Amino acid sequence: MRIVLQKVSEGSVDVVDETSGEVDTTFEPQHIGIGYVLLVGVEDTDGAKQIDWLAHKIANLRVFEDENGKMNRSIHDVDGSVLSISQFTLYADVRKGNRPSFVKAGAPDHAEQVWHAFNDALRAQGLDVKEGRFGAHMRVSLTNDGPVTIIFDTDELGI
């Protein structure tokens, strides 16, 4: 799995109807205050091991400032929330040509299952998790705090 974590003071997502270009009213826009916006990419080899490790690490990561201005508080400590966005483009391969290849991204059925399982694992860690819509054209807005952006790649981490 590949995750781009951004510490935010707020974040939101809505879905755009690809035919009309208008906001899709069948999707209730999601909004969080302080917390994380997670861009989540899945590959076919991802499963429970990657899900569990990432959910635990993200839930306990200390990147929020304490009273001394040090990154020493977790998302739990600040009563933060998570906005999780599926994003297969994190597996773009741009080595050849000018159009990215996404062959390393997980098959849609598998990726959707893993993404939902990951969101559930975050909830099991006690986090409030809002979601975009898998496979949809979304508009994601966020206000970075810091900025703090951390990239997790379970392949590179050997997980």
Curated annotation (Swiss-Prot):
Self-association and partners: Homodimer.
Name by which UniProt lists this protein: D-aminoacyl-tRNA deacylase
GO cellular component: cytoplasm
GO molecular function: D-tyrosyl-tRNA(Tyr) deacylase activity; Gly-tRNA(Ala) deacylase activity; Ser(Gly)-tRNA(Ala) hydrolase activity; tRNA binding
NCBIfam families, per the entry: D-aminoacyl-tRNA deacylase
Subcellular location: Cytoplasm
ATP-binding recorded as keyword: no
A Gene Ontology BP annotation from the UniProt entry: D-amino acid catabolic process
Xref: InterPro entries: Daa-tRNA_deacyls_DTD (IPR003732), DTD-like_sf (IPR023509)
Superkingdom of origin: Bacteria
Keywords: Cytoplasm, Hydrolase, RNA-binding, tRNA-binding
Main location (coarse class): cytoplasm
Reactions catalysed: glycyl-tRNA(Ala) + H2O = tRNA(Ala) + glycine + H(+); a D-aminoacyl-tRNA + H2O = a tRNA + a D-alpha-amino acid + H(+)
EC number: 3.1.1.96
Organism: Bifidobacterium adolescentis (strain ATCC 15703 / DSM 20083 / NCTC 11814 / E194a)
